[in-house]
UniProtKB/Swiss-Prot annotation:
It comes from the Eukaryota. This is Small ribosomal subunit protein uS2. It is found in: Cytoplasm. One of its GO terms (molecular function) is structural constituent of ribosome. CDD domains: RPS2. Pfam families: Ribosomal_S2. Keywords: Cytoplasm, Ribonucleoprotein, Ribosomal protein. One of its GO terms (cellular component) is cytosolic small ribosomal subunit. NCBIfam families: uS2_euk_arch. Its main location: cytoplasm. The keyword Lyase does not apply.
Length: 264
């Protein structure tokens, strides 16, 4: 009996990971310009995205990123908390600039502010939550790559990567695949070897979970031995308590003589 396992192509392997991370799950609402990326509609009304087109747009986005000579000219933005860790890790491995959290208005248009920047490419996690940088990029003539769900507006978006941009697993995998493809195209990572960085490194982690975990560890840890008051106290020997001292002139004879200058 043959036990040979079929070797998956890079495309099949990537799509299999997308299915596990629910990248294909869209929303019940559908933007008119996103119809081309929808495969079907489930019975519960949720639109299912075409992962073949997701993979194609992912490859196209990676080639655009590699075409920019200076990686620092690429800005990755995520106002959504689930994408904050993913954009930071993407910037770490590709050399791009990451802006996680609130976007300061005017960063692309107002030259007076301290955080003013002039990137050549903008990558956003969600065109709806990151509407401010997308709008400013249109004024500054900066191309935009966006992770777009079935209900995402495509205004001022040049490259739309259809995917689930609301789940933390989906966002982490998309930035992981994009970073991996960028490293492949740059030659930093050979295609014959798998990337030793796990997708979990791009996954968002709730700080409250760490606090609860630390509290659970403290509760289960063995308590320190309790010491009684008698163990803290140190008693002097009985002889010292009943020892009689002389407080006459003979006992204080050494204090009467003045100190010589040589002793100083």
């Amino acid at each position: 009996m043959s036990t040979n396992k079929k070797v998956q192509s890079p495309k099949e392997e990537s799509i299999a990971k997308m299915l596990i991370c629910k990248v294909h799950i869209g929303t019940k609402n559908l933007e008119n310009k996103m119809k081309r990326y929808v495969y079907t509609r489930a019975k519960d009304g949720v639109h299912i995205l075409n992962l073949a087109k997701t993979y194609e747009k992912l490859q196209l986005a990676a080639r655009i990123i590699v075409a920019i000579n200076n990686p620092a000219d690429v800005v990755v933005v995520s106002a959504r908390p689930f994408g904050s860790r993913a954009v930071l890790k993407f910037a770490q491995y590709t050399g791009a600039q990451a802006i996680a959290g609130r976007w300061t208005p005017g960063m692309l248009t107002n030259q007076i502010i301290q955080k003013f920047t002039e990137p050549r490419l903008l990558i956003v996690t969600d065109p709806r939550t990151d509407a401010q940088p997308v709008k400013e990029s249109a004024y500054a003539n900066i191309p935009v790559i966006a992770l777009c769900d079935s209900d995402s507006p495509l205004e001022h978006v040049d490259i739309a990567i259809p995917c689930n941009n609301k789940g933390k697993e989906s966002i982490a995998l998309m930035y992981w695949l994009l970073a991996q493809e960028v490293l492949y195209l740059k030659g930093t990572l050979p295609r014959s070897k798998p990337w030793n960085v796990m997708v979990d490194m791009f996954l968002w982690r709730d700080p409250e979970q760490f606090e609860l975990k630390n509290l659970a560890i403290e509760e289960t840890a063995p308590a320190a031995p309790h010491l009684t008051e008698n163990q803290f106290a140190t008693e002097a020997p009985y002889e010292e308590w009943n020892k009689k001292e002389e407080w006459n002139d003979n006992a204080n004879e050494e204090w009467k003589n003045p100190i010589a200058a040589e002793e100083w």
